[in-house]
UniProtKB/Swiss-Prot annotation:
Homodimer. A motif ('HIGH' region) lies at residues 10-18. The gene is trpS. One of its GO terms (biological process) is tryptophanyl-tRNA aminoacylation. The keyword Transferase does not apply. It comes from Treponema pallidum (strain Nichols). This is Tryptophan--tRNA ligase.
C-alpha cells in the first residue's frame, strides 16, 4: 500500500476548482492507499500573517474539516491533521533548507504568482521557502504520491530533488514521491479569466445552496462573439462546457449540447440551466452531509485531534531515522569538572 499526502491552506471554503484539482482524486484513492490530508495553516503565514487574519484561522480550519468530511473523506481511513500541531515539520524544513539553493527556489513560477496575488512587492523569506516547507510536509509523512493540480507539480519535483540529495548524502531514508495529477485541467473561474478563486469572486463553493449555484451559473462567461442563439458558438475555452465536462455525468447530453452549440441551434440559457441542474445534483449530498456535521462540533474536534496524534507518531519515526542517518541522534551528556 502506497502512502499519499496532500492538503489545503485554510483560507476559505472549498470550491469546485478544488474538487476538480485534487480533492476528487483523494476520494477515489483513499480506499486504496494510506492517506494523510494536511490542513496547512503554517503555509498561510506566507501571505496572511496579520493579527486579524490569524484570528480567523480557527473558523477557517473548521470549515476545511467540514468540507473534507462532507465530500466523503473517511476519517477512519485517512489522517486529517493540522500542520502547526506537528512541530517536527519545521525541524525537517530547516534541514532541507540547507540542501536547496536560492536560485533554484526563485525558478519556481508559482511563488511569483502567489506574491502578486497577495500584493507583495518583494518576496519574503517565508514565501521563498514555501516549497521547502512543502517538501518537509511530504517527506515527513514518507509519502509516495502527492495529488496536486498542474500548477503545483513543480513543488513535487523539488521535493524529489530534495529527497534524492538527502538520500545520496546520508543514506536511503525517503521515498521519491511523484505527483498524481487530476484528469481535469485547472478549472477556470466563472468569469473565464483565471483559475477559480475565492479572492477573485469567481468561485462556486461546495457548500453553495441551490439558488446560489443557479445564480452563479446564469452569470457565467461564455462566447463573447455569440450575441444570438442562432450564431455558431465556440465550445473550446468556454467555461460552461468545461464545467459540463467536469461535473455532468450525462456525457451524451453534453456531446449533444456541444454539437448544437457549434451549429447555432441552442441558446446559452438552455446550456446553463442544464449545467446548474447537474451541479446541484452533484452538490446536494455534500450539502446534506455538511448540514449534519455542523451539528456535531465535538466529532469535528475529535477527528482533528486524533489525526494530529497519528501524524505526530509518524513524524517522530521519520525524524528518528533522519537524525540517525545524519549522526544527529542524542548522545550522552559530557559531565565537565
Amino acid at each position: 500500500m502506497l502512502r499519499v499526502l496532500t492538503g489545503d491552506r485554510p483560507t476559505g471554503r472549498l470550491h469546485l476548482g478544488h474538487y476538480a484539482g485534487s480533492l476528487g482524486t483523494r476520494l477515489r484513492i483513499q480506499s486504496e492507499h494510506e492517506c494523510f490530508f494536511i490542513i496547512a495553516d503554517l503555509h498561510t503565514l506566507t501571505t496572511r500573517h496579520g493579527r486579524a487574519q490569524l484570528a480567523e484561522l480557527p473558523a477557517l480550519v473548521r470549515e476545511l474539516v467540514l468540507d473534507y468530511l462532507a465530500c466523503g473523506i473517511d476519517a477512519q481511513r485517512a489522517v486529517i491533521y493540522l500542520q502547526s500541531a506537528v512541530p517536527e515539520v519545521t525541524e525537517l524544513a530547516f534541514i532541507f533548507a540547507n540542501l536547496v539553493t536560492v536560485p533554484r527556489l526563485q525558478r519556481i513560477p508559482s511563488l511569483k504568482e502567489m506574491a502578486q496575488a497577495a500584493n507583495l512587492s518583494e518576496l519574503p523569506f517565508g514565501l521563498l521557502g514555501y516549497p521547502v516547507l512543502q517538501a518537509a510536509d511530504i517527506l515527513l509523512a514518507r509519502a509516495h504520491l502527492v495529488p496536486v493540480g498542474k500548477d503545483n507539480e513543480s513543488h513535487v519535483e523539488l521535493t524529489r530533488e530534495v529527497a534524492k540529495r538527502f538520500n545520496r548524502l546520508y543514506g536511503e531514508v525517503f521515498p521519491l514521491p511523484r505527483a498524481l495529477l487530476s484528469d481535469c485541467a485547472t478549472l477556470v473561474g466563472t468569469d473565464g479569466q483565471a483559475k477559480m478563486s475565492k479572492s477573485l469572486g469567481n468561485a462556486i463553493f461546495l457548500s453553495d445552496d441551490e439558488e446560489t449555484v443557479r445564480r452563479k451559473v446564469r452569470a457565467m462567461y461564455t462566447d463573447p462573439a455569440r450575441t444570438r442563439a442562432d450564431i455558431p458558438g465556440r465550445v473550446e475555452g468556454n467555461p460552461v462546457f468545461a464545467y459540463h465536462d467536469a461535473f455532468n455525468p450525462n456525457t451524451d447530453e453534453v456531446a449533444h449540447f456541444k454539437e448544437r452549440y457549434r451549429a447555432g441551434r441552442v441558446g446559452d440559457t438552455e446550456v446553463k440551466d442544464a449545467l446548474a441542474r447537474a451541479l446541484n445534483t452533484f452538490l446536494e449530498p455534500i450539502r446534506a452531509r455538511r448540514a449534519q456535521l455542523e451539528q456535531q462540533p465535538a466529532y469535528l474536534a475529535r477527528v482533528l485531534e486524533e489525526g494530529c496524534a497519528r501524524m505526530r507518531a509518524e513524524a517522530r519515526k521519520t525524524m528518528q531515522r533522519v537524525k540517525e542517518a545524519m549522526g544527529l541522534s542524542a548522545r550522552p551528556l559530557v559531565h565537565l569538572p
